[in-house]
Regions:
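Blade-level signature of beta-propeller repeat domains, shared across WD40, Kelch, NHL, RCC1
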Residues: 350, 354-375
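Hydrophobic beta-strand positions that form the internal "hydrophobic ladder"
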Residues: 69, 116, 158, 208, ...
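Residue-level detector of Asp-centered blade-edge/turn motifs that repeat once per structural unit
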Residues: 64-65, 110-112, 153-154, 202-204, ...
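Canonical WD40 repeat/beta-propeller blade segments in eukaryotic WD-repeat proteins
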Residues: 54-61, 98-108, 144-151, 186-200, ...
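Surface loop/turn motifs at the tips and blade-to-blade linkers of beta-strand repeat domains
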Residues: 49-52, 95-98, 139-141, 188-190, ...
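A short helix->beta-strand "capping" segment at the edge of beta-propeller domains
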Residues: 29-55, 88-91, 334-335
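Conserved strand-to-loop turn within each blade of WD40 beta-propeller repeats
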Residues: 72-75, 119-122, 160-164, 172, ...
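WD40-repeat beta-propellers
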Residues: 78-83, 125-130, 167-172, 217-221, ...
Length: 375
């Protein structure tokens, strides 16, 4: 039986009253969970230990109005940024202490201006009211640190993925688990490592995708609730998968072939690209690893034929133009880098465009989020 616990808002209030009695047990449980999160340091930086006291932005999203940005931090803080207010205003940012563990992924609920769903490295799924910080609903996937969550286009379903290698599909109305998605054909693979990205298709309401550390993208049919196909290649270590119509974009935490494109109509990889970073030819840059950006996140611009990728090591954000992407065998010459932010001071973990496509927000290993105007 799948170990998933669901709690309503009234139950949340009751549980809060019992917290003091459970502190000793919680401290022991929390320490155990923190020890089990050693893998998370590899996601954050290949050469540094995880620091629970340093506030880093792991996930962020514009809402559909372009007025608000939700950002999740390593300290368990949820930040809501009001784009209609000046940055120096007290109303520009509201902060809510949601969890003692990192918020690893979040999404705004479709057709709802005030509800955010987020997941934590402790295994919690929380729905939060953006204007008050009140927890509306909580679900716990016990002993399963969660890395990703996504809503279906109509907001009726959401899916999660994490440490235990399974994608779970939930009914948003009842907040109940529909099914832990598995394969039913042995000629198809299943995930053999942690899942870092889940994505519902906006074009096909019956299509859901997942990817992670096992270099495999699984495709699920929502109607049969099972694996229907797969793609091989990307080593995903963050919000590193995006869809636009039939085009799938992925980025990898690898030193080579970090950007891969797939055509879902043919279930075929159509492009593999190296994240080349030009450096001055000097003694400090003879090691090729110095010129590599290990990528975490990617996003299609909703209004034109560009996409953004972000990464670490060489802390980088780059925007590509794929306007000439009209053939089955795409070469690097057909994908043009049109804008770079190179040698950022901190690893860049996440990015998002507003719905108009004229602004890009990105988050990194520092508290403040940053913007690019794209006009």
């Amino acid at each position: 039986m799948d170990s998933t616990t669901i709690t309503s808002i009234s139950q949340v209030d009751q549980n809060n009253n019992q917290n003091n009695e459970q502190n000793n047990q919680n401290e022991s449980s929390e320490q155990s969970l923190r020890e089990n999160l050693d893998f998370f340091q590899n996601v954050i930086d290949a050469n540094s230990n995880f620091d629970f006291d340093r506030e880093e932005c792991f996930t962020l999203r514009y809402d559909d109005t372009c007025q608000n940005i939700a950002a999740g931090y390593s300290t368990g803080t949820l930040g809501i940024y009001n784009m209609e207010k000046p940055e120096e205003s007290q109303d520009y940012k509201k902060s809510y202490n949601i969890s003692t563990f990192p918020i690893t992924c979040l999404r705004w609920k479709p057709y709802n201006k005030t509800t955010i769903i987020l997941v934590t490295a402790e295994g919690y799924i929380l729905q939060v009211h953006s204007k008050s910080g009140k927890i509306l609903q909580e679900i716990i996937e016990e002993n399963n640190p969660l890395m990703c969550v996504d809503y279906s286009l109509d907001g009726m379903l959401f899916a999660t993925g994490g440490n235990d290698k399974y994608v779970r599909l939930y009914d948003d109305n009842t907040k109940t688990l529909i099914k832990k998605l598995e394969r039913h054909r042995y000629d198809l693979p299943e995930h053999s490592n942690r899942i870092f990205a889940v994505k519902f298709s906006k074009k096909d309401p019956n299509l859901l995708l997942s990817g992670g550390w096992d270099n495999t993208i699984l495709l699920y049919d929502i109607r049969s609730r099972e694996v229907s196909n797969y793609l091989y290649g990307p080593h995903i270590c963050g919000d590193g998968m995006d869809l636009k119509d039939d085009l799938l974009l992925t980025v990898s935490w690898e030193k080579e072939d970090q950007i891969q494109l797939f055509d879902l109509r043919m279930n075929k990889k159509i492009g593999v690209f190296q994240m080349n970073i030009k450096e001055n030819n000097n003694e400090n840059n003879k090691n090729k690893l110095d010129n590599v950006s290990y990528l975490y996140s990617c996003r299609f611009n909703p209004s034109n034929n560009t996409f953004c990728v972000t990464g670490s090591n060489k802390n980088y954000l780059r925007i590509y133009d794929y306007n000439n992407l009209n053939c089955d065998n795409i070469t690097e010459e057909r994908i043009k880098a049109i804008r770079d932010l190179n040698d950022l001071k901190h690893p860049c973990y996440c990015c998002d465009y507003n719905i108009k496509g004229n602004k890009l927000v990105y988050g990194s290993a520092k508290t403040k989020i940053d913007f690019l105007n794209l006009i």
